[in-house]
Amino acid sequence: PPSGVSLWAELPGAQVVLGDRLVLNCAVAAGTGPLSFSWHRGGSGAPLATGARLELRHAGHNDSGHYQCRVSDGDSAAESDPLNVTVLGERDPRAGAEP
């Protein structure tokens, strides 16, 4: 059975600015046979997506929450610990501009 499921964000602290892109990755330490990955938010039963990678192309306020990755080998499944994703407010149009 799959075990050691880990989940991480490509941005520090799993924080993303509203409208920016966020990528989450999932990996499994042990498991044999074909493995399937599914993504869940807030304990929802229906998967958001499948595959070892979840990409939110334009993060919105409703994308904040706890994400989990579930890995299954067809017979049994294991889940990652929840990762809290925070979508921050509007990007400051002055950011990066010279004073």
List the predicted regions and their residue ranges.
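Conserved Ig-like domain signature around the intradomain disulfide
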Residues: L22-L24, L35-F37, N62-G74
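Short, flexible loop/turn segments at beta-strand junctions in immunoglobulin-like
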Residues: Q15, R57-G60
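A short beta-strand segment in extracellular, disulfide-stabilized domains
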Residues: Q15, D20-V28
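Extracellular/luminal immunoglobulin-like beta-sandwich modules
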Residues: P1, Q68-R91
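Surface-exposed, proline-enriched loop/turn segments that connect beta strands in immunoglobulin-like
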Residues: L7-G13, R41-G43, A95-E98
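Surface-exposed loops/turns
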Residues: L18, T50, H61-S64
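Solvent-exposed loop segments of extracellular immunoglobulin-like
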Residues: V28-G43
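Short beta-strand segments within Ig-like beta-sandwich modules, predominantly Fibronectin type-III
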Residues: G43-R53
